[in-house]
Amino acid sequence: MKIVIADDHHVVRKGLRFFFATQDDIEVVGEAATGLEALRVIEETKPDLVLMDLSMPEMDGIQAIKKAIQQFPDTNIIVLTSYSDQEHVIPALQAGAKAYQLKDTEPEELVKTRQVHGGEYKLSTAIMPHVLTHMKNQHDPEKEKYYQLTRREKDVLTEIANGKSNKEIAAALFISEKTVKTHVSNLLAKLEVADRTQAALFAVKYNLNGEISK
């Protein structure tokens, strides 16, 4: 898996590069110190994942995410930042980030964010209250779609919002991975959302059964 690291701090970039060097299936193919440089490196290296800080010169991370998604729609971007406030979290997710992690995240959790490359979705538990508050404050014409889901589809949706992979959902619900995939496909269609990221945000909006990680 090819990764690009975009952060304006040299020490952070080198630290991440050193850490990922210990992972057999991860290769750091580029680094960037500014938002503009990140776009150039993404174009040159076509990485599977991009670790993006939000505070960078020339172009901040949020603008860089927007432009990267516009120019390279298949790009999977993981925000790695020290900001946990709503003013940064929500715009970053709306810009197209597939994961949002804080810089004090445990290394093992950071490695798990690679799952966004396979369609998974990862949010730091520290930012979930901000996401929930934002979604609750939005006008809600879509609520009826939730009630179209079966009980099992709701269970699967809750697990998606908690950042679990299909394999983990299957184990938690005692069903096969193939059955999980079927439920995911069905609930995406019923909710009229394009991917697991949007489904997870939908789940956070309704705080399903209080089971979503706070």
UniProtKB/Swiss-Prot annotation:
Q: Which UniProt keywords apply?
A: Cytoplasm, DNA-binding, Phosphoprotein, Transcription, Transcription regulation, Two-component regulatory system
Could you state what the record's PTM comment says about this protein?
A: Phosphorylated by YhcY.
Which CDD domains does this chain map to?
LuxR_C_like (cd06170), REC_NarL-like (cd17535)
In terms of Pfam families, this protein maps to: GerE, Response_reg
GO MF annotations for this entry?
DNA binding
Is Phosphoprotein included in the keywords of this UniProt record?
A: yes
Q: Which Gene3D superfamilies match?
A: 3.40.50.2300
According to its UniProt entry, the protein's GO biological process terms are: phosphorelay signal transduction system; regulation of DNA-templated transcription
4-aspartylphosphate PTM sites in chain numbering: D53
The Response regulatory domain covers 2-118
Compartments, as annotated in UniProt: Cytoplasm
Q: Which residues form the HTH luxR-type domain?
A: 142-207
Q: Which InterPro entries match?
A: CheY-like_superfamily, Sig_transdc_resp-reg_C-effctor, Sig_transdc_resp-reg_receiver, Tscrpt_reg_LuxR_C, WalR-like
Q: State the coiled-coil residue ranges.
A: none
**Role according to the record:** Member of the two-component regulatory system YhcY/YhcZ.
Protein name in the entry: Uncharacterized transcriptional regulatory protein YhcZ
> Which organism is this protein's natural source?
Bacillus subtilis (strain 168)
